From Swiss-Prot:
Keyword Nucleus belongs to the record: yes
PROSITE patterns for this protein: RIBOSOMAL_S15
Cross-link Glycyl lysine isopeptide (Lys-Gly) (interchain with G-Cter in ubiquitin), where in sequence: 27
Pfam family, one: Ribosomal_S13_N
Native source organism of the sequence: Homo sapiens (Human)
Protein name: Small ribosomal subunit protein uS15
NCBIfam families, sorted: PRK08561.1
SMART domains per UniProt: Ribosomal_S13_N, Ribosomal_S15
Gene: RPS13
InterPro entries: Ribosomal_uS15 (IPR000589), Ribosomal_uS15_arc_euk (IPR023029), Ribosomal_uS15_N (IPR012606), uS15_NS1_RNA-bd_sf (IPR009068)
HAMAP family: Ribosomal_uS15_A
Subcellular location: Cytoplasm; Nucleus, Nucleolus
Assembly: Component of the small ribosomal subunit. Part of the small subunit (SSU) processome, composed of more than 70 proteins and the RNA chaperone small nucleolar RNA (snoRNA) U3.
Record key words, sorted: Acetylation, Cytoplasm, Isopeptide bond, Nucleus, Phosphoprotein, Ribonucleoprotein, Ribosomal protein, Ubl conjugation
Residue list for modification N6-succinyllysine: 27, 34
Amino acid sequence: MGRMHAPGKGLSQSALPYRRSVPTWLKLTSDDVKEQIYKLAKKGLTPSQIGVILRDSHGVAQVRFVTGNKILRILKSKGLAPDLPEDLYHLIKKAVAVRKHLERNRKDKDAKFRLILIESRIHRLARYYKTKRVLPPNWKYESSTASALVA
């Protein structure tokens, strides 16, 4: 997928394994993986961080192949899913950081421009999540309350 606010085409991406079956050397069962996911979610980790830990420490390449469900669906079934979608959360976090930078460096025109781009991405993503009913229809991004969302 191409980049939104940059000239790069973004063609590089990781390839999923061809076989969708569980490797024979993996000794973890579906329930073991789910318990591990619950434990990591209770520590406050995001779904992608959970996936990285499971991949690097436990040898689970794809949680979906082992459990039959994605990490976020497993968390939703247990009520441990984050309130905001992860990509939206990170964009808001970035916007808060840039706004904090602009408070200290008022003349930084480039940062001001980048903040506009970040916030336009936030609005676009929020509109998408409202149509998919992930966010409530009255949810609105406001820069004044954004720091409370990511705190």
